[in-house]
């Protein structure tokens, strides 16, 4: 039986230091073999499997929240592009969406994605394109009001060209930011993944117009060889 997700020791340390070497099977590309070997030896992958999370990305949002404390009991959270669901699992626990901590306020977690997902206890999941014309209005209806947190771990499909992928994810992040402007409560928080590459300036400028503070963070759970980082914008101003 999988353990309940927890916030302790998010570093991935404490796992047995056993390295797995994968042989290249006939018909399998060398790059696929390397990816599989990295997955099998990744301490965060091992922790996610043992603690019941749907992916190692859960530890990224755990580490970001440990620092910025935006997933508080009672918060209403929207997770854009939420598949496979690791971020939703973390949010459910931290905002007390199941009401397990009776002395704390009970929050809610709403996840949207283009693909259908397996249910997550404590989260409400919808198959929705957040860039559709009426998506923001629909989300507010489902929430019964505005959100305290909008978060996104989305990434566009990889093209294999670093700069193209960078531009695509910046465009996706900007779309998520405009969505957040429409659904966030005053003082709310926006969290999103970006890839470093030189085109972040306009995104930073946009966010600084609407948030009191904007930080760029590479949490420990992000792989060191990745250009991935996260923007955490706090103190949303409903009026620019």
Swiss-Prot record:
A GO molecular-function descriptor: rRNA (uridine-2'-O-)-methyltransferase activity
Biased composition (Polar residues): 1-13
Active site, UniProt feature: 193 (proton acceptor)
The encoding gene: rlmE
Native organism taxonomy: Bacteria, Pseudomonadati, Pseudomonadota, Alphaproteobacteria, Rhodobacterales
Family to which this protein belongs: Belongs to the class I-like SAM-binding methyltransferase superfamily. RNA methyltransferase RlmE family.
Amino acids binding S-adenosyl-L-methionine: 85, 87, 113, 129, 153
Pfam families for the chain: FtsJ
Subcellular location, principal: cytoplasm
Annotated keywords: Cytoplasm, Methyltransferase, rRNA processing, S-adenosyl-L-methionine, Transferase
InterPro entries: RNA_methyltr_RlmE, RNA_MeTrfase_FtsJ_dom, rRNA-MeTfrase_E, SAM-dependent_MTases_sf
Record carries keyword Cytoplasm: yes
Location in or out of the cell: Cytoplasm
Name by which UniProt lists this protein: Ribosomal RNA large subunit methyltransferase E
